[in-house]
Amino acid sequence: TYADRNTEIWEALANSILAVDENHIMTFHPFGRTSSATHLNNKEWMDMNMFQSGHRRYGQKKGDGDTSVTGLEEDNWRYVEEALSMTPLKPVLDAEPSYEGIPQGLHDPAQPRWRDCDVRRYGYWSVFAGSCGHTYGHNNIMQFLKPGTPGGYGADGIEKPWYKAMQDPGFNQMKYLKNLMLTFPYFERVPDQSVIAGTNGNRYD
């Protein structure tokens, strides 16, 4: 969903929810390679920001031929930096990075699949940049795939079922990132990219 389109609808939805429930965190899940912070950070109903670094690799275009709207591509730490530079300051989370086992680009089963090393990279990139947490996803778990049942996003009915995908390495390695985050008090963690020695690498470097 684009945050800068049909804004009157999002405003009406948010305000209607607030009218009956003021006790839950509210945010906005945006379209791929975009962030709620860009257009909605100043909204009073927006408690925290979300962005979607998405499922495309560097330079990969959407089906309609458009390139990345922001130019940030899959560098999800850049979305974190951008959101944390805004006023008022709000927590930010990558709500949809690349999912383990999903085709790069999302829909073409002939494309390479995102692996455990990729989902780890997104997790540590965003958390070390200052995000309030991280989202993990798996293609087979997301669809609750079961044997013999074709699914979407490259699933052809012969892939492992969702309950076996729960043994995949990326799924099981996310606990290390979680444990690292919980080691330190939440409100004492302060984003500080200046602690990085040397210059930032490029893409996978």
Set out the residue ranges of the language-model regions:
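Short, surface-exposed loop/helix-turn segments at secondary-structure junctions
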Residues: 64-68, 106-115
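Aromatic- and carboxylate-lined catalytic core of secreted/periplasmic carbohydrate-active enzymes
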Residues: 88-92, 99-103, 119-205
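Structural recognition of alpha->loop->beta junctions
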Residues: 41-54, 118, 124-133
